[in-house]
Amino acid sequence: MREQRATAPRTKPALLTRLNRMTGDGTPVVTYSIIAVSVFVYLLQLIPALGVTEALLYAGAYSYPQFFEPWRMLTSVFVHSTGGFPFHILLNMYTLWIFGSLLERMLGRWRFLVVYLLSGLAGSLGVLFLAAPNVAVVGASGAIFGVISAFLVIHQRLGANMTQLVVLVAINLVIGFIPGFGISWQAHLGGLIGGALLGLIFVQTRKRSQQTLQIALLIALAAVMILLSFSKFLV
């Protein structure tokens, strides 16, 4: 019996096998995971008693010493407007599915995650510095603008013609300035700038011999963003 057990082939659960295939064939796992988490959080938001939206949204006031809750600068990226038809989350997740999948395959999973999170943080910094402290924001738009911006910068620097995408981004940015749409242009602009900086870092340090420099620049950029998030302590 012992000999039979030792020689018998070991089988993996179907779920583990599928996950191994996904992580090995270029499937944009991080993009899909972000979409899944965002949808799950949205469903929780629909239960008023949980108070998810109020607990995770961001406003500039939460970066002031009196109300300091810095985690909201990132958690707000995963919550969306729940009023009426779920247009907000559907549009954001559809856009993320398109550009996130492309950028993740290009950069790899961990680099893409860095782009998404730091772009989201940059979007919140835009709200902190450009919006009134009591203006609350939710949504992944800042992070997604960063993803698109990084995608655009990388392709532009590599010689691709990105004119149509530049026009599309410009139109969406301008729409944010139109009163009545309820769009946070501040988050869009912040994410756009953050994503562009990240794109420049990746495209300028794409050689294998520059990996240490790339990591150092990413850490430096993240450190600057974190320091900026504490800026209201100096006021």
Each PLM stretch: what is its role?
Residues 1-23, 176-235:
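C-terminal transmembrane module of polytopic alpha-helical membrane proteins
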Residues 26-140, 178-186:
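N-terminal TM1-TM2 helical hairpin plus the immediately adjacent luminal interfacial "cap"
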Residues 34, 38-45, 97-98, 150-151, ...:
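Alpha-helical transmembrane segments of multi-pass membrane proteins
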Residues 90, 140-148, 189-193:
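Membrane-embedded alpha-helical segments of multi-pass membrane proteins
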Residues 100, 150-154, 195-203:
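Hydrophobic transmembrane alpha-helices
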Residues 104-107, 155-160, 204-212:
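Membrane-interface helix-boundary motifs at transmembrane edges
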Residues 118, 164-173, 214-222:
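Central hydrophobic cores of alpha-helical transmembrane segments
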Residues 125-129, 159, 196, 200:
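Membrane-embedded alpha-helical segments of multi-pass transporters/permeases
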